Amino acid sequence: MTKKILKVGTRTLMLSVLTTCVLSASVFAKPEEGKLVIWINGDKGYNGLAQVGEKFAKETGIPVTVEHPDKLEEKYTQIAASGDGPDIIFWAHDRFGGYAQSGLVAEITPDKLFIDKLFPFTWDAVRYDGKLVGYPVAVEALSLIYNKDLIKSPPKTWEEIPALDNELKKQNKSALMFNLQEPYFTWPLIAADGGYAYKAENGTYNVKDSGVNNTGSKAGLKFLVDLVKNKHLNADIDYSIAEAAFNKGKAAMTINGPWAWANVDKSKINYGVTLLPTFKGKPSKPFVGILTAGINAASPNKELAKEFLENYLLTNEGLATMDKDKPLGAVALKSYQEILAKDPRIAATMANAQNGEIMPNISQMSSFWYAMRSAVLNTVSGRQTIDAALNDAEARMTK
């Protein structure tokens, strides 16, 4: 504990009652010295994070507020640019290249002792232009989640799903429901046969070379469109619809990440987590996201944020508290991952991650998300052909 932290903590204790809040805020103030504000997405364990904040507040005198605004990754770009926003932001690492390029997150400088506590590949994901721009927290990859009472063994291939769906329809069930509205969920199929966002070359990315419009991507998207055309999937399925259908036993399978397990547990569904199906004999290729905690470049509390992240959250106890609220999946901290690795769900997450690829952490990824979202929605709804939609996507991403 630094003297600076103790002094700020004493002053804060004298002035106010400590509170730790969890809310979805609509008004965002400038960062305030002697108080930590944290943003994290609503599908993550924000209540658990708040509990870690309570411990920090109790021991240091620094109040911690945890907020989960909608579309926080976009709001942060706008708000942080004017010197406002949270002290700490949690999001997948791919956004942090853009944040760093725009000067919105601070470079971090953990010592070697701390660096060695985390898996090296997780640090690679948060390195931009040779600098570390965030703390890796968890390793996220999509998996196939299946209801063991509806199917004895999950399909190994995407090509098996239509026949399985036809059988399950006799029981008024669906084989599979997953979020078609966001390309993060549809990309594993589209990328399986050779699609890629941007070409990796010599430790960087060629932003003029995108594989969203190659033969493999077209084949994957066509298969998805055919699932909709043949009424095995509905074009309007979003995250909430898919989650509710699976958790109510109406769908035998869904595609989701570790953050979804807590709600499945509550539903009492007898479920398993396994490898995503192959397509044309090749593994589905999910993006591997590293849940990352970055420090706002405008924050007056950078040392407090470092203390919170290094000595409270990124510990066995801190991650266990967050994981208990909503599962983190695999984690960056070696010591806690060793504890978690016995869970077959986490073994499946790591296996899918090994088949996938680390999301590029370049600012152009925002173009990828927008372009591929439009391409998928326009094709499954019949508004565009596959060729036209992917031509447009490639043009938007490489202009």
Regions found by a protein language model. Name each.
Residues 2-5, 15-18, 26-98, 112, ...:
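Conserved N-terminal structural module of periplasmic/extracytoplasmic solute-binding proteins
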Residues 30, 126, 274, 322-371:
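Long, aromatic- and glycine/proline-rich binding clefts that accommodate carbohydrate-like moieties
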Residues 37, 54-59, 63, 132, ...:
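Extracytoplasmic/periplasmic substrate-recognition and gating elements
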Residues 86-87, 115-148, 175-178, 282-285, ...:
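A structural signal for short loop-to-beta-strand junctions that line the ligand-binding cleft
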Residues 93-143, 153-165, 274, 341-351:
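Hinge/lid segment of periplasmic solute-binding proteins
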Residues 133-137, 142, 162-209, 251:
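Extracytoplasmic/periplasmic solute-binding protein
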Residues 165, 206-236:
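Glycine-centered hinge/linker elements that transmit conformational signals in sensory
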Residues 352-399:
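Conserved C-terminal helix/tail region of periplasmic/extracytoplasmic solute-binding proteins
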